[in-house]
A protein has these predicted regions:
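Compact, glycine-rich, soluble single-domain proteins
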Residues: 30, 71, 81-85, 214-219
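Bacterial N-terminal signal peptides
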Residues: 7-15
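Terminal, regulation- and interaction-focused segments at domain boundaries
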Residues: 21-62, 120, 142-215
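Mid-chain, structured segments of secreted extracytoplasmic proteins
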Residues: 65-108
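Positively charged n-region of N-terminal signal peptides that target proteins for export
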Residues: 1-4
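Beta-strand/loop substructures that line and gate deep hydrophobic ligand-binding cavities in soluble
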Residues: 95-115, 250-264
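A cross-kingdom marker for long, charged
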Residues: 206, 210-295
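Hydrophobic alpha-helical segments and helix pairs
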Residues: 106-149
């Protein structure tokens, strides 16, 4: 009995240490000399063998040197749906691949960073379960690489729960409305139809539909060469490729997105104001493109 209590105490203490730490945005999992296709296959297998489900993948900016793999798991989906303020946006986790010369760099978004940034109200009750999902994802990718070097900046749980880039910049709760439909079903039909047509040079990378909850999330590739990913990613940093794709969420009859000035800043928190000014039009361009998918 004493041994059990001691073990539980150690586990609890370890969790408290993790919860109190600053969370990096990304981990560099490792580097491979294999081809992009081969590395992507290894990542897929590693995640699927650990109970995760691959929901979509694509070449951001239509670049052969960039690749994003999106995945989820049933327990994550259930937790995400319990956060009614757009929590389903955190259902999709991402791995990024970037080809540099004769090697491929593998990175992943840190699940706990995303969870703290997106699950605003009531995360404490779900924290242990979310930590397990995060650790399972990292453990799965140990078959791919062993570095797990943090990069991209770091923030504390406290700051992530109320994150905004600067004074007068939006918070998570300041979602931008794209359109309102007569019903959830109509919204689903319109968005799907426009994505099938590739309207606005977009790509339907993944969709998660929870019809019983009247919630759907679409991961959308922004492939317009003038104002899409190929325009802004080279400026703010392609190493953060596990931030893509951008998302639309349909809840009930309303389609919304996270403001670009929030979502971009959250995934690139080390951006200087000078660099942000270089993509000043990007948040509006993204909104216009995604709004077009709802019309």
């Amino acid at each position: 009995m004493k041994r059990l209590i001691l073990t539980l105490s150690i586990v609890l203490l370890a969790q408290l240490v993790i919860f109190s730490q600053n969370q990096p945005v990304y981990f560099q999992v490792g580097t491979s000399s294999e081809s992009m296709e081969s590395v992507a296959g290894t990542v897929r297998s590693a995640l699927e063998n650990s109970g995760f489900r691959i929901i979509g993948e694509y070449n951001p900016a239509n670049s052969d040197s960039l690749y994003a793999i999106c995945y989820t798991r049933k327990d994550l989906e259930e937790i995400a749906l319990s956060f009614t303020d757009r929590g389903a946006l955190a259902s999709a986790l991402k791995v990024g691949l970037k080809k540099e010369y004769n090697s491929v760099k593998i990175s992943m978004i840190n699940p706990m960073y995303l969870f703290y940034g997106y699950f605003i109200d009531g995360i404490d009750k779900k924290e242990s379960a979310l930590l397990k999902i995060s650790e399972d994802a990292k453990s799965a990718l140990k078959d791919v690489g062993s570095e797990f070097k943090p990069f991209g900046g770091e923030l504390s749980k406290e700051k992530l729960q109320k994150y905004h880039y600067k004074v007068m910049m939006p918070y998570f709760k300041d979602a931008e409305e794209l359109n309102e439909f007569d019903s959830f079903e109509e919204g689903l039909k319109v968005i799907r139809g426009n994505l099938e047509k590739g309207k606005g040079n977009t790509k339907n990378v993944y969709e998660l539909v929870y019809a019983d909850k009247k919630v759907a999330v679409f991961g959308v590739g922004l492939l317009n060469v003038e104002d899409g990913e190929s325009q802004f990613l080279p400026i703010i940093g392609e190493d953060h490729i596990a931030a893509m794709p951008y998302e639309i969420i349909l809840q009930g009859n309303e389609a919304t997105i996270l403001p670009g000035r929030f979502r971009i800043a959250l995934h690139w928190p080390e951006l200087t104001m000078g660099t942000f000014m270089k993509i000043m039009s990007t948040p509006g361009d993204i909104k216009n493109t995604l709004q077009g998918l709802t019309e």
